[in-house]
Structures are given as structure tokens and as C-alpha cells.
Amino acid sequence: MTLNRGGKMGLSVKRTSIISLESRMELDKKGVGVDLGGKKLKDLLENANKNNNKNNKTKCKDEELKSENISLEEIKSMHQYCLDELNWQGINSIKPPFDINSDGPNKIDALEKYESFQPGFLFRIFKFLEEKKKRELLKDIEIAEMKDKALFGDYEKISQLSLRVLNGDLDCYFQVIDEIRPFDRLLKLGSEVEIGTNDSGSMEVEFKVNSEKVIPKSRFNKEISGNDEEVEITYYEMIEEYVCSSILFVAKNIMNIIPVNKVVVHAVDNVVDIDKGAKNDITILSIVFDRETLNKLNIKTVNPIDALDYFICNMRHQKASGFKNVDRIVQY
């Protein structure tokens, strides 16, 4: 294990991207991932699942969240809101919706309606009504063909994307993260996330806690009773729980949507730097999550602080004064 002495800010990898609520990720124009034709990946996955094995399902929806409405209990329980895992092997094995050399389901249905049309009494008297109805049914066949073409096109997009993800295509990794937006829950609270990687087996994250924004002392003091010292200690404990819960949330969400085996998270916050004696943005936690160990944890019930003991981790937290600066783990 190699350390970055002093916990220098920024990621030590070649490919990075800042995740923002206001804008989409700036993907490398030379490698644009898979063209989804303006459609959302979530919608394509949900549509594909309707006609295939239920075991391949995914729930990518993120509940609406506003920091002023969320309780302090929820803030320290971020790890309980992880996305379901995307089974890329299962997605890649999804069968085509129909044989491309044959008529699709929509056209078959439209043709059946056209061929089974039997003019009634009025149609036989007023021939123009019969002709009008037949034109409508023929138009429905054309529309059905377009629907089938779009249906097969969606299948091809998902098939191509899943194959490239399984092959470790970094452009597609970033595209999936940009489309599914696994960190929005943290971003809505006021934290920030930057991701990066050098290879297809790992992802590195700088998690900017912004604790004073997420848990303002003014709000905390109103909701927590006790003397000043007790409230101060409880406040620092709350920040510790939020940070540990959030890094579990970050690592688990990344591993749930892209097939990396390691996620390295560096948590940064504006706290007193003991080396400089003044408040500064410093690394307060650095941890290496491996997939095998993380998968063994019951993410819904685990104590996030205790969970860190299972991983290579640098963290210093004092009961009366909170987090202290630590060295970053840069080789893992």
C-alpha cells in the first residue's frame, strides 16, 4: 500500500470527471460510449426487462430528496438507499424481441386486424367508409413497423452497451454513471463527488463532504438537546456517521452499476488542519473497498463505522473535535 503524504487534494488518475446536479458529465468526445438515440438508459433497461427474464431487472430510480426535509436519522443512513445491482451478464444475454428477418409483434398485430376486417352494414352501403377504414388500418401497419424498428433498435443499443461494459470499456463505464446518476442523493444534500480511473478494474472517488452545508450547526443545535459540550460531541459523531455511511453508499452504488472489483474513496472536508492550525480542505478518510468483502456485508443493517474495519482504511476521528487529516491511499 502506498500513501500520499499529507492527503493532497485531487485524484491521482488519468481519467476523471466531476459529477454535478446541474450538468451532465463531460465525456471524452473521441470515445462517446454507445449512442442511445436520445433515450434514457433507465428507460431502455426497463423496456428490455418487460419482455425478458425478471431476474435481470433493475431499479435505478432515486427518490426525491430535499435537504431541508430529510431527517438527521436519514442523513446518517445513506447506505440504506443503494441502487439495486445491474446484472450486465444477464442484460447481455437478453434475447432479441423478434427475428429481424421476420415481422415484429406490432406489425403482426396490425396485419391481423387488417386481414380480419369485415365491413358491416353501413360500410357496405357507404363504400367510402370502408375505403377510409382500410386506409386507416394500412396506416396502422406502417406505424407498427416503425414501432418494431424502434423496439429492435433499443435492443441493439442495450446489447452493444452491455457487451462493452463487460469488456471493461471506460467510456461506457462513465456513460452508465452519467445516465444512472448514482450519487444524486448525496449531491442534493450538498456534498460533491469526483470520479476517476486508470483501468477497468477499479474506480477512485473524491467525496467532498461539505459537512457544514449538509448538517448546519444552526439546525443541529435546534434539534439536539444537552449542554454545549454534549451537543458538540454529538455533532462530531453525526458527521462521522454521515461520512462513513456515505462512502459505503458511494462504493456500493458504483459496484452495483459497473463491474469494477475495487472502489477507492477519499473523503474531504473543510476542518482544522492540525499541521497548519487553521481550517482547510483536507483528506479525512481514505479507504479501499473490494467487491468480495463488500458483498459479504448486509448493507441495509451494517453499522457503517464498524464496517470500515473490514477494509484497508486511513481515518482519525476524535470524540471532542472530529476528523483529522490523514494520508491518502494511492496504490492499491
Predicted regions and their residues:
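Long, charge-dense low-complexity segments
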Residues: 2-19, 23-28, 33-332
